[in-house]
């Protein structure tokens, strides 16, 4: 593992020229108190959690203990303005000091945050950074996904602390803190609003749109922009290139603000796409997902985003790109990002490659009664999948406390705000299989208040309350029978055929849904499932497929890839051929 991992710019949707990456070797200590450790335990490779092999530590942070990080740093070149310290994600709660001064903190293990550290910097240099972290894992109500201190089966080792890139940038005194970019497919426009650090906003906002390096729209500080801090640019018809999996066109966007002196100017670079999601009946009156007004078969994989050496954190940006490119080459166009939020670069690569993402809200809440929420409901799903998620059920689902419900509302808003800039995100998934579920109808309303341009899968699997855009089925055990409904039907989890590929076996007991004994058997069973079980249901309304899963994960050996992504387990040519057959059948059905 390199000593300066993941050097790439971490925030592609809001880029500046100033950038100083702080990934690399830091000092660390795990103690029983929040105070500065008397001594350090050794080095840790940031941004890998201490539980991972890649970190060089291999220790688990227990609830009630503290993980401390320390390093020296040099601020980005230049003078004046402000110096900002960015964290891609820290799990779960942290306090940050620079040169002994508390500069801020954060709670929430999946979302980026930024701290202005200018006033704490040492004029003579020799700046030092200290981060103290706590992570309650399963003892709290916070979002935690599949993390557990007792891994096995469908739950995986906990990870904690810094797990995404840490970086610095120098900005003007009045700088752009956030861009709100709102494309309108039907109007062929994009509206840009810049939020700035000082009261009064941007005194003068300008924006330029380029397509393939050619300037196609610009506004250099109109009166309209001056009044409301936003500007709308019109895309010429000859440069109207809708985004889709077959043609994932991205427009380049440059935005700037000026306010008198040169040092008050700020310029950022971004991008956007023109695309539109909807649900509408096909030629036979059956409800379908539509992208840019045309029915589309969403054919994809469940993606949990784990890596053997780094758990949540990939070994390199290149490894991420290779995985996503291979998924696309196999003929898939969809990934359901399950129980995790990825670093911004992951979504950027999906934007570029044309991979649609259904994004789960990361599950949290108190302890789940798994005998009820997972095992009993899975076995008796036809009877239980539409149980009302009213208050009497909240204790079984881990949402009995007001604090847990408030935490979920905060996390939902943070997720939508963090990811709504990415064209690849096509659907929000508030709940999965009842884990931490409560008032799913209210969650749908909350999502749509934040973002009404995307689909919503209210409750993936079960405890479906009849809302959102998707009738979302999980089926591993029963014959698949689909019938047209008022919402679009998605098979949002299925398959999961296990095969522990020789040389890539899991460290503990293998886990999956039925086991193949060879590559040939795995390929044959996968083809049979897709062509004999799934394909006939397309004409009955099935419009989205999410096979479990992208890769093996810890004990789970039901991936199409091995855990290290070194091999594709079924025959790749067969996978491509089957996906082509599904696409051809769907196109014929909806004609």
Residue spans for each PLM region:
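N-terminal carbohydrate-binding accessory modules
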Residues: 179-180, 254-327, 581, 586-588
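Accessory beta-strand-rich segments of carbohydrate-active enzymes
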Residues: 8-13, 27-32, 59-175, 199, ...
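Substrate-binding/catalytic cleft of secreted carbohydrate-active enzymes
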Residues: 334-579, 585-590
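Short, aromatic- and glycine-rich surface loops/edge beta-strands on solvent-exposed regions
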Residues: 128-131, 247-259
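Accessory carbohydrate-binding/adhesion or oligomerization-edge regions at the termini
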Residues: 1-54, 132, 136-141, 212-214, ...
């Amino acid at each position: 593992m390199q000593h300066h991992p993941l050097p790439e710019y971490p925030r592609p949707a809001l880029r500046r020229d100033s950038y100083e990456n702080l990934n690399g070797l830091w000092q660390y200590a795990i103690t029983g108190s929040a105070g500065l450790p008397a001594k350090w335990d050794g080095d840790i490779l940031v941004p890998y959690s201490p539980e991972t092999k890649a970190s060089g530590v291999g220790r688990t942070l227990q609830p009630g203990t503290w993980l401390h990080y320390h390093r020296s740093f040099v601020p980005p070149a230049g003078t004046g303005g402000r110096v900002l310290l960015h964290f891609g994600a820290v799990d779960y709660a942290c306090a940050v000091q620079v040169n002994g001064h508390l500069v801020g903190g954060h709670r929430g293990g999946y979302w980026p945050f930024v701290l202005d550290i200018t006033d704490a910097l040492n004029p003579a240099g020799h700046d030092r950074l200290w981060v103290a972290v706590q992570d309650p894992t399963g003892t709290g109500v916070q979002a935690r996904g599949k993390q557990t201190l007792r891994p096995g089966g469908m739950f995986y080792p906990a990870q904690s602390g810094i797990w995404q890139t840490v970086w610095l940038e120098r900005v003007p005194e009045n700088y752009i803190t956030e861009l709100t970019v709102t494309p309108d497919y039907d109007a062929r426009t994009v509206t840009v609003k810049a939020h700035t650090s000082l009261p009064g906003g941007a005194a003068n906002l300008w924006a330029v749109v380029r397509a393939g390096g050619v300037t196609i729209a610009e506004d250099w500080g109109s009166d309209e922009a001056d009044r409301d801090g936003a500007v709308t640019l019109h895309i010429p018809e000859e440069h109207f290139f809708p985004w889709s999996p077959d043609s994932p066109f991205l427009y380049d966007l440059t935005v700037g603000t000026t306010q008198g002196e040169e040092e008050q100017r700020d310029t950022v670079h971004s991008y956007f796409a023109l695309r539109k999601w909807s649900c509408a009946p096909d030629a036979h009156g059956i409800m379908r997902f539509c992208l840019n007004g045309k029915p589309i078969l969403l054919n994809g994989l469940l993606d949990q985003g784990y890596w053997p050496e780094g758990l949540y954190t990939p070994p390199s940006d290149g490894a991420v790109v290779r995985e996503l490119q291979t998924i696309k080459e196999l003929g898939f166009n969809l990934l359901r990002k399950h129980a995790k939020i990825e670093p911004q670069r992951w979504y950027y690569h999906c934007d570029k490659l044309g991979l649609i993402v259904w994004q789960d809200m990361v599950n949290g809440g108190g302890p789940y009664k798994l005998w009820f929420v997972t095992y009993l409901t899975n076995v008796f799903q036809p009877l239980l999948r539409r149980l009302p998620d009213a208050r009497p059920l909240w204790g079984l689902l881990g949402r009995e406390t007001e604090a847990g419900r408030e935490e979920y509302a905060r996390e939902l808003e943070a997720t939508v705000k963090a990811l709504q800039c990415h064209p690849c995100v096509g659907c929000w998934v508030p709940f999965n299989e009842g884990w931490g579920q409560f008032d799913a109808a209210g969650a749908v309303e909350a999502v749509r208040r934040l973002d009404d341009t995307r689909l919503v899968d209210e409750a993936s699997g079960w405890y479906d309350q009849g809302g959102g855009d998707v009738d979302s089925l999980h089926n591993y055990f029963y014959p698949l029978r689909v019938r047209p409904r008022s919402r679009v039907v998605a098979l949002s989890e299925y398959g999961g055929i296990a095969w522990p590929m020789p040389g890539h076996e899991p460290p503990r007991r293998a886990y999956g849904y039925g086991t193949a004994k060879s590559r040939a058997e795995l390929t044959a069973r996968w083809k049979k499932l897709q062509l004999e079980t799934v394909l006939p249901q397309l004409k009955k309304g099935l419009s989205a497929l999410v096979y479990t899963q992208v890769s093996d994960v810890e004990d789970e050996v039901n991936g199409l890839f091995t855990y290290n992504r070194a091999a594709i387990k079924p025959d790749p040519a067969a996978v491509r051929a089957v996906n082509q057959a599904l696409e051809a059948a769907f196109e014929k059905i909806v004609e």
